[in-house]
Each structure stands twice: as structure tokens, then as C-alpha cells.
């Protein structure tokens, strides 16, 4: 089991361009973390909605995408290929993320990234779908399997401006529909 940080602000990740992303710099801002994949059926919808949310709250929201290949091998690109895959394949049409993508990682199992160990400990299941895990157990390629595991690509975690994990959303919850919760956390008129 991965080490579980004491605070959200103790965590970090490495961006696709190799820079350390220190979560301590996010104090006072809401943070949306989503495990992503460039070859999933909802890639276009979710990536464009992540861009939209980042553009709507440019100074008060941090969006972080964590590419992961644990679900249907739908992120089989190497780190250096991910941006080109997004630009030319899916979503395509010159798409460029306006948010930070970090290096590919595992979100479940023995080698899960510390960010996901922390978030799953604090938010053990999506509020909108607390009962689903994997639809097909043959697709589980990690061990150990836990009830709190991320079930598929594009699960989302929203963290408040004080660093408290607020809510976890399932893969079926449209990313753009998180906006009212972001406004609530940021105390913006809805």
C-alpha cells in the first residue's frame, strides 16, 4: 500500500514536461483532479470540459489530469506522446489542454500514485454512484483490489481551497456538471 500523506498540501506530482508540481502552491484555490486517458470513448467530452472549467476559473481553480493505462489500456502512449495524441487523434483538431497534465501513473494497486492513495482514503467512493466498481472483473489488472479503487477513466476528485477533499464523482458524471460545486467552494454566486 502506498504511503498516505497527512495533508493534501504534502503531495506533489511531475508534469509531462518533467517539472515538479508542488500541491502546497495550490493553497486558497479549488483543485479538480481527474484520471484521464486519450483513447477512451469519453476522451473528447471530458478533455474539452476540463478546458472549459479551467477557463471559467483561471485564477481560482487548478485542474490536474493524471493519465493512466489501467482501464482498458486506453492510455498506451508514452508521456512524450500524450500531447500529440490529444492534438491530432482524440479530441484532435489541434486540441491543447489549458490545464496541467502530469506524467502517466497508476491510480490503483500496489504502485498507486500517492495522490490517489490520499484521495481514495479521504473519499472512498463517488457520491453519485457509491455502489459500482468495475463492470467486468476480467478488466482488473492491478492488485490488491480495494472497494475504494477508481473504477474507470475520468473519475474526478474536487478539493476545496483549504485543502480538504470535498467530493468524488464517478466516470459517468459529466465533468462540466461539477461547476456548481466549484462555485460553492469558491463562494461564487451560482
From Swiss-Prot:
Catalyzed reaction equations: 2 glutathione + H2O2 = glutathione disulfide + 2 H2O; a hydroperoxy polyunsaturated fatty acid + 2 glutathione = a hydroxy polyunsaturated fatty acid + glutathione disulfide + H2O; tert-butyl hydroperoxide + 2 glutathione = tert-butanol + glutathione disulfide + H2O; cumene hydroperoxide + 2 glutathione = 2-phenylpropan-2-ol + glutathione disulfide + H2O
Segments forming a coiled coil: none
Keyword Cell membrane annotated: no
Q: Which GO terms describe its molecular function?
A: glutathione peroxidase activity; phospholipid-hydroperoxide glutathione peroxidase activity
What EC number(s) is this enzyme filed under?
1.11.1.9, 1.11.1.12
Its cellular-component GO annotations read:
cytosol
Write the record's keywords in alphabetical order, separated by commas.
Answer: Cytoplasm, Oxidoreductase, Peroxidase, Selenocysteine
Compartments in which it is found? Cytoplasm, Cytosol
Q: What class of enzyme is it?
A: oxidoreductase
Coarsely, its chief localization is: cytoplasm
Q: Where along the chain is the active site annotated? A: 40
Q: Name one GO biological process term.
A: response to oxidative stress
Quote the function comment for this protein: Catalyzes the reduction of hydroperoxides in a glutathione-dependent manner thus regulating cellular redox homeostasis. Can reduce small soluble hydroperoxides such as H2O2, cumene hydroperoxide and tert-butyl hydroperoxide, as well as several fatty acid-derived hydroperoxides. Cannot reduce phosphatidycholine hydroperoxide.
Instruction: Output the PANTHER family linked to this UniProt entry.
Output: GLUTATHIONE PEROXIDASE, GLUTATHIONE PEROXIDASE 2
Family membership, please give it.
Answer: Belongs to the glutathione peroxidase family.
Spell out the subunit comment: Homotetramer.
Q: What is this protein called?
A: Glutathione peroxidase 2
**Naturally occurring in which organism (per UniProt):** Pongo pygmaeus (Bornean orangutan)
Primary gene name: GPX2
